């Protein structure tokens, strides 16, 4: 959904919590530069200081490494952080995502997340991805990587129109 405030982060975190509470090894990937899922799952550690050492490495650094020519890239599994909940892990977000997005706009980079999640998926029963409130590089990367998609939206005419536009964009 290309709109904030419809509950994407809350739904993502709550579905992940239910999954983990059922004994399933669960991962949340926070692709939203607002870092709401990260804050839900890591609590005070994540509030107001996304650059804290406890929040590194994060998904912003994962994408930034594709822009670097420094050699071997770290696998996505090295970006996973435990949470205070059993069976629930998170790859935290960072506001840096918004700053580097324009540098990632290329056809081969859009598939990087799908390839990385394919590798890490063997370690998890369920992976939930929280996306930003925009149809951008990160949202498209998540849609390409996902097996299923849940799109929350308000039931007004504007939101329905935005949903139809999103579905058309995904179809392309």
Mark where each language-model region is:
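P-loop NTP-binding core
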Residues: 1-172
